Amino acid sequence: MSGPLRSERKVVGFVRDPLPKVGSLSLKSEHAQADLEHLGWRNVESLDLLWGLSGAGDPDVALNLLIRLYQALEAIGEDARNELDQEIRQDEKLRVRLFALLGGSSAVGDHLVANPLQWKLLKLDAPSREEMFQALLESVKAQPAVLEVEDFSDAHNIARDDLSTPGFYTASVTGPEAERVLKWTYRTLLTRIAAHDLAGTYPTDMRRKGGDPVPFSTVTMQLSDLADAALTAALAVAIANVYGEKPVDSALSVIAMGKCGAQELNYISDVDVVFVAEPANSKSTRTAAELIRIGSNSFFEVDAALRPEGKSGALVRSLDSHMAYYKRWAETWEFQALLKARPMTGDINLGQSYVDALSPLIWTASQRESFVTDVQAMRRRVLDNVPEDLRDRELKLGRGGLRDVEFAVQLLQMVHGRIDETLRVRSTVNALHVLVDQGYVGREDGHNLIESYEFLRLLEHRLQLERIKRTHLLPKPDDRMNMRWLARASGFTGSMEQSSAKAMERHLRKVRLQIQSLHSQLFYRPLLNSVVNLSADAIRLSPDAAKLQLAALGYLHPSRAYEHLTALASGASRKAKIQAMLLPTLMEWLSQTAEPDAGLLNYRKLSDASYDRSWFLRMLRDEGVVGQRLMRILGNSPYISELIISTPDFMKQLGDAASGPKLLATAPTQVVKAIKATVSRHESPDRAIQAARSLRRQELARIASADLLNMLTVQEVCQSLSLVWDAVLDAALDAEIRAALNDPQKPDQPLANISVIGMGRLGGAELGYGSDADVMFVCEPVAGVEEHEAVTWSIAICDSMRSRLAQPSGDPPLEVDLGLRPEGRSGAIVRTVDSYVKYYEKWGETWEIQALLRAAWVAGDRELGIKFLESIDRFRYPVDGATQAQLREVRRIKARVDNERLPRGADRNTHTKLGRGALTDIEWTVQLLTMMHAHEIPELHNTSTLEVLEVLEKHQIINPVQVQTLREAWLTATAARNALVLVRGKRLDQLPTPGPHLAQVAGASGWDPNEYQEYLENYLKVTRKSRQVVDEVFWGVDSMEQREF
């Protein structure tokens, strides 16, 4: 038997390919393999090149540009190509700079391809200031100009024969050729700066070594020096164009402003300049205009809009003319802009005289009355100019962006620089360092902000370099390719846990949150350190410096505010320490309200009232939303503040539950039941009313807080307030009846049933915070009781209830008004149903019938209330409708109201009740239409103005546009009227004139308090449209002048 069959296999050993796959090199192009082979890099000898290429911001773009660069060199000669190939294999620094540059900026790469031999410049160090001046001035064959200025002996030219300084030069190359060579030279120098900068964020790992990091301040200084040299060269060409071979007869100084002035310039940015000359004549003006033209065509946009009077002002002024303008006319923002002013080129001595002369005006600008509001308005205008959908992508102008840091730092400089001259520095980063060193900002906070600011500037630089284009806009979140490029070009690397883009986005979120808490870090925490040391390394502001800072932050009475801080946070108690930790954030929130002073005082009162409540500070510490909502209330509404201070436990309702805000967790009907149930437990009517007041106080605080925090609509507010009044009236009536029955000297059984009929806004469930309760009382004798006895007993009950409710207390008043009853104030307080019917049949006047349109049962005996309403329906909704005589009477009375009821001195345009297009206009229009059509449309048997408007639209009585106009005006005027009570603590109908009081009303109406002018304009626009509809519908005419009675 033969042996088992055996198969023989040839074992081949596995040898790993030493060359990385294109995917491992972060290359995604389908041509990548072929391109690497074309370069001759798909071999072991080229591993350093392959791994080096993989570190580029965008390896595919870098590879594409390398192919083009090699081809451009091949066109020169094979030796030119081989020289570059050999150099990048041997010179690691060159390799890193070249790959970082090509992968970080396709535009600069294009310049290199167009000028292929310039790769050799990447072997050099970044250009020095002197080298930049020499390169640009040599490009136009410049030489020092002759300066001969009459009547100005201080004229001085610091130009040198070696072309290494600013000053007056004259160019031999002019015209289009000058612009061409200047542009080429500028781009070449920019390429060298960018190569070193990009190499600084080229990643280092085990396979490749990165470049030396270049500090942010070094890059921005180099770019600013380049701008100085560029405009010096442009000035040389301008002088040649204007003066030819003649001496320069005017000392012209170019003052750099903005980022260039501060020597913190971007790669691509407008360069802001101002011109000062002695004398400021036609030739100096032509020279300045030529400099702007040449500079803008060759380098970057040169902008002179920061000069006095802006673009409409003279381009060139003398020093005296500048001084006269700034002393008399300049606005706050113009002094803020001067913080960055720096002599750039031309007559440097004259430029320094300009800076020295204006310096005192800069440092006293913070004493101007409008300083704080001006600075806040400037920042708000910047934000408003950013479209909402771009704010998260906007590095410069969005929230948590560069401008937030710059504005805040400049504000601190202007506040404290008046006294502390060390703060008189130009650059943002240098100013932050000084603020830290001098103790105005905590060391850790300051250094974190510097890092955050420099990181955002790094992203800004990378975005601008990519296409040599001015931009501050991040790629869209779903643009993963560009997000990846930006992250890699900025030095982020991927890992197993997250990609480079995710790492960058995560860090960016952290940075923005840090900057958004800027005011707390820069302004409020140092303030608290002046009262109590929050940390061992924090240097305390002196009391005077702290008060200066409080004034700059919008506190009108900084000494009092400082006193409040001291009372709250000083001392060694645990409460004081917690207050010291909380107050920086709380004060930041207060600063966004209409009255920070009042808000801080209210917070101190509330803290005193809550002293024995251990949960108070703990809740503020642990539930940030409570503190934020509380500060908004305390700084905007004295009305709610008083309610909360008298009921501190209410604060617990400012937090959130699992289902949402606790303020909305309680239904108004539950509150009604609670008031009635609580009152029923008290035998004494005084205690019963006291209990009702307490519950009403809490409910008013809940409604008003939810209203101020924009959690309730105007309709929901009015309905909730009406339900509270209904409950109080019902509970009070019940308490009075029980007290009367318990009085041994009075009957022990009720002699009548009593019902309370709501009139006016109470009847329509449209009460405001300051509204009285307009009511009528109706009674019905119980079986076996004479009518006069029942009425007498009912009058005693109702009178007692009204008196008890009206007793003075610390709560908002409870006034019950009977002015709409038959015969007005001289009529009987209580009537039976029959008595009411007889009165209306025999003596009822048109205005009384009109008033019945709002009658609704609100409290007491429900059946009796319904019976009363049914009995008056024939008067208010007559079968054949209102007569023409009644309609004329309504219009006649309305005309008298318009002419006679408006209080003396009131403004008809802004009176929320009796003003043009305001509440009375709208409600009378709706009531007139109800009287005209209710007999045909039963749905109009409704006491609510807004609901009746819906019915009128549904049945096409008036058109939808008219209905919407009246509805919007009613809601706007009602909201304004409610806001007036919230901010003034009492019923007012007249909007304040523009200023702080109107800012409060705007804030309470859900607007930014600083936008009070826009709020007023909106109110006027809405009510003006409403008045037009009233004229058309109520009066039936096109203008007020056509009415006759």
UniProtKB/Swiss-Prot annotation:
Gene Ontology cellular component annotations, sorted alphabetically: cytosol
Q: Where is this region: Adenylyl removase?
A: 1-527
**Which reactions does this protein catalyse?**
[glutamine synthetase]-O(4)-(5'-adenylyl)-L-tyrosine + phosphate = [glutamine synthetase]-L-tyrosine + ADP; [glutamine synthetase]-L-tyrosine + ATP = [glutamine synthetase]-O(4)-(5'-adenylyl)-L-tyrosine + diphosphate
Keywords assigned by UniProt, alphabetized: ATP-binding, Magnesium, Multifunctional enzyme, Nucleotide-binding, Nucleotidyltransferase, Transferase
Q: Name one Pfam family in it.
A: GlnD_UR_UTase
Q: Which cofactor does it need?
A: Mg(2+)
Q: Which family does it belong to?
A: Belongs to the GlnE family.
By what name is this protein known? Answer: Bifunctional glutamine synthetase adenylyltransferase/adenylyl-removing enzyme
Q: Which organism is it from?
A: Corynebacterium glutamicum (strain ATCC 13032 / DSM 20300 / JCM 1318 / BCRC 11384 / CCUG 27702 / LMG 3730 / NBRC 12168 / NCIMB 10025 / NRRL B-2784 / 534)
